[in-house]
């Protein structure tokens, strides 16, 4: 049997359409998790599904290898998937095909990658000749903090081996990406009617000043060659006030800083506090709240896992893997960071060129090739 026959392209497409039909965008991975666990168990695969919080489980599937002493390969995908809610030409929960494109809700981030990894573990179960254990971690609540991945890695590992995180990297291999710190700044002033503006303290104007300054701030952090475009600072929400004829008593900014390895919530908080101190408006009170934080991934451009993936690419695509450190994946946050922190030699490799937009799609060829490459990598990794 040729490598390409190990996983049916048509079956994978139908699986991906089914996965995309589950609405799992906001705290609601339970139905998708139940479907995956049932499907895998029906094929005789060892499955552990455990609630991380009520109704929101991880699904961990394991296909044992011939030799349990060999280092395992972990493939990781998240089940939560946000998607653009308006502007679609068809129902996003009913995926459709046009040429090599599969359209559907959250199909590139990362329902397509998840389906590819499920197909990989199923194919490994059928072949029954893996040299090492292959573990699928289908996790809940990736969004920034990676709660599902942190839970399974802390509770059962593995703490040694290799990992592939399947976030959409457009089939390029990334060994490094930044972290993230998200924040909210609340400004409190004093309300006043438009006829008595002098009695008020305008929180919205104070927040606008911060918005302008934050856009040009340079966070404290040591620049590194592997993450040349970081750090970045972005404020995505600015709101305040409650009436057209009233001085705004409160305003809020919500921002996102993509970080370098020596940056963390404490350094970001300090940088934000300095910006506030330099632009403080008399009569205003300021509050900083760090709302989420996640570490980055910093591996090496030459590693055992990259060599194995390159070998898999050559067998599946007749060409080597492309190693990249470019945007946008450089500014992603992935569960690969937690996999590496747990002790796994980890890279990011997944199908899809992610864009949060209506009519989101994924290349069917890339999705199929990704599944085959994940499977072949388990064979390419060296024995010890």
Regions found by a protein language model. Give the residues of each.
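Metal-dependent amide/peptide-bond hydrolase catalytic core
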Residues: 1-7, 48-51, 83, 175, ...
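Acidic/histidine-rich catalytic neighborhood of metal-dependent amide-processing enzymes
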Residues: 110-182, 383
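Acidic-glycine-rich active-site phosphate/pyrophosphate-binding loop
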Residues: 82-98, 160, 175-186, 347
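A structural signal for short hydrophobic beta-strand segments in well-ordered beta-sheet cores
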Residues: 47, 61, 95-97, 235-238
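Active-site metal-coordination/substrate-binding segment of hydrolases
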Residues: 70-138
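Short glycine-aspartate micro-motif
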Residues: 72-74, 102, 159-165, 182-184, ...
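Short helix-capping segments at alpha-helix termini
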Residues: 43, 126-130, 157, 278-283
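N-terminal helical capping/dimerization or prosegment-like subdomains
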Residues: 2-84, 250-254, 268-271, 364, ...
């Amino acid at each position: 049997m040729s490598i390409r026959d190990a996983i049916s392209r048509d079956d994978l497409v139908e699986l991906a359409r089914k996965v995309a039909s589950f609405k799992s965008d906001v705290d609601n991975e339970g139905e998708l998790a139940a479907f995956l666990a049932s499907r895998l168990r029906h094929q005789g695969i060892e499955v552990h599904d455990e609630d991380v919080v009520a109704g929101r489980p991880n699904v961990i599937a394991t296909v044992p290898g011939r030799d349990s002493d060999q280092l395992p390969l972990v493939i990781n995908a998240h089940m939560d998937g946000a998607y653009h809610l308006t502007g679609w030409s068809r129902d996003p929960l009913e995926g459709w095909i046009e040429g090599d494109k599969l359209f559907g809700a959250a199909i590139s981030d990362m329902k397509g990658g998840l389906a590819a990894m499920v197909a990989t573990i199923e194919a490994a179960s059928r072949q029954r000749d893996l040299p090492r254990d292959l573990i699928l971690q289908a996790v809940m609540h990736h969004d920034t903090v990676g709660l599902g991945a942190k839970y399974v890695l802390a509770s059962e590992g593995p703490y040694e081996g290799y990992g592939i995180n399947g976030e959409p990297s457009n089939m390029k291999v990334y060994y490094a990406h930044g972290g993230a710190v998200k924040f909210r700044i609340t400004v409190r002033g004093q309300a006043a009617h438009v006829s008595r503006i002098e009695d008020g303290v305008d929180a919205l104007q104070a927040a606008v000043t911060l918005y302008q300054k934050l856009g040009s701030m340079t966070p404290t952090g040591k620049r590194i060659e592997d993450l040349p475009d970081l750090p970045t600072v972005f404020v995505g929400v600015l709101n305040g006030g409650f009436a057209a004829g009233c001085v705004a008593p409160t305003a809020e900014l919500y921002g996102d800083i993509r970080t370098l390895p020596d940056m963390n919530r404490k350094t970001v908080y300090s940088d934000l506090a300095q910006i506030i101190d330099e632009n403080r408006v008399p009569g205003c009170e300021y509050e900083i709240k760090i709302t989420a934080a996640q570490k980055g991934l910093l591996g090496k451009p030459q590693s055992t896992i990259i060599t194995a993936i390159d070998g898999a690419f050559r067998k599946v695509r007749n060409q080597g893997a492309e190693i990249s450190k470019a945007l946008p994946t450089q500014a992603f946050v992935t569960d690969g960071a937690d996999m590496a922190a747990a002790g796994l030699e980890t890279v990011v490799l997944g199908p899809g060129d992610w864009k949060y937009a209506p009519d989101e799609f994924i290349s069917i060829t890339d999705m199929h090739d990704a599944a085959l490459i994940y499977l072949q990598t388990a064979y390419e990794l060296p024995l010890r």
